A protein has these predicted regions:
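Chitinase-like catalytic core of GlcNAc-active glycosidases
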Residues: 27-273, 277-303, 314-315, 330-336
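Glycan-recognition surfaces
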Residues: 287-289, 322-325
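C-terminal helix/juxtamembrane-tail motif
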Residues: 321, 328-343
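Fungal secretory targeting signals
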Residues: 1-34, 40
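Structured C-terminal cap/extension of enzyme domains
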Residues: 310, 314, 319-320
């Protein structure tokens, strides 16, 4: 997913804009009654059960610093501030740091009351940590400490170092395994959310010399809560030499999305990935909100809703992800969930 990387001066100037009003309902006092603050914080961060309804936000929105009002994203249960890069926080992740501790606590409490977790997404299409020689353990330590410092519910690993994966020498997979292991050491399972956002083609069992995401899953899948699978051939935006009539329309029908991918990216439809050993409950279906959000893979909300209903009828319940707010809002997720998990 593409980071806008707004100039820091624009991000800094947004601090002076009014903090968006966040609507909320009172916390259920009985849930936290008798618990100390540490226990309350852990319960508030606890990993939610499927289905997961995830929305990313990287785009500058005038008048809003950090997350929007809860009413704007009702129906989602995870909001990903994007992106934390190897160089530091940018865009929505940076905006979060500019709020005072009291403001962050207020927003966090209101999102928690609405059942929405706040996480940070890291890397995106801008960072190429393996190709750049970044130490995975050191970087994981830095990023995990950032999550803790800024009181978020977890971290999403949107790794898009395509050159490293294409090399087929296993370095990308080894980097991800080390990075994930260290993240989970510092962000314990059940207390913090840890997700990955791979593109669907990386789950192919026949293409990647280093083993691809199936190797990553075999090594550390037990540490990853779920995968926000970018079933949008997003790498095609970056690697035009992979464009073909077949690839450009990949994952745009329910059959292609759920049961049988094309020969361009073999065995990467939802149920095919599950057949390769990844639990269905961990495979969240990711799509762009608009035709402008990605060069391919777009589905209308009605078509996507139909696909989700079909998947649910076959035992799937993982949920859906969208790139990004404000292209998608409460209305988008209400339409997408209408036939399967209505809001």
């Amino acid at each position: 997913m593409v980071s806008l990387l707004l100039a820091r001066i624009i991000s800094i100037s947004s601090v002076f804009l009014c903090l968006a009003r966040v609507n909320s309902t009172p916390l259920n006092a009985t849930v936290f009654d008798g618990l100390d603050q540490q226990a309350r914080d852990i319960l508030a961060r606890a990993t939610p059960a499927a289905p997961h309804w995830v929305i990313y936000s990287d785009q500058f929105v005038s008048g809003t610093t950090g997350p929007p009002a809860v009413s704007a994203v009702t129906g989602f249960n995870v909001f990903a501030l994007s992106f934390l890069l190897t160089e530091g926080a940018f865009d929505k992740a940076f905006e979060w740091t500019t709020l005072t501790a009291a403001q962050r606590a207020s927003v966090k409490a209101q999102y928690n009351a609405a059942g929405i977790k706040l996480v940070v997404s890291v890397f995106g299409s801008t960072d190429v940590p393996t190709s750049s020689g970044v130490n995975p353990v050191t970087m994981a330590t830095t990023m995990a400490n950032w999550v803790i410092e800024f009181n978020l519910d977890g971290i999403d690993v949107d790794y898009e170092d395509f050159n490293a994966f294409d090399a087929g020498d296993g370095k990308a997979e080894a980097w991800l395994i080390s990075f994930t292991t260290q993240l989970r050491t510092l962000l314990p399972q059940g207390t913090y959310i840890l997700t990955h956002a791979p593109v669907a083609p990386w789950f192919s069992p026949t293409i990647w010399g280093g083993g691809g995401y199936l190797k990553v899953h075999a090594a550390v899948g037990n540490l990853i809560d779920w995968y926000n699978v970018q079933v949008i051939s997003s790498e095609l935006r970056k690697r035009p030499y992979h464009f073909s009539a077949e690839g450009a329309t990949e994952y745009t029908t329910c059959a292609n999305l759920l049961t049988t991918s094309s020969n361009t990216w073999p065995q990467t439809a939802l149920f095919q990935i599950a057949s390769s050993g990844v639990p269905l409950s961990k495979l969240v279906i990711g799509k762009p909100a608009t035709t402008g959000a990605a060069s391919n893979g777009f589905m209308s909300t009605s078509t996507l809703a139909s696909c989700l209903a079909q998947a649910k009828s076959q035992g799937w319940n993982a949920g859906a992800m969208v790139w990004e707010y404000p292209g998608a809002t409460a209305a988008w997720i209400q339409a997408v969930r209408a036939s399967s998990f209505p809001v």
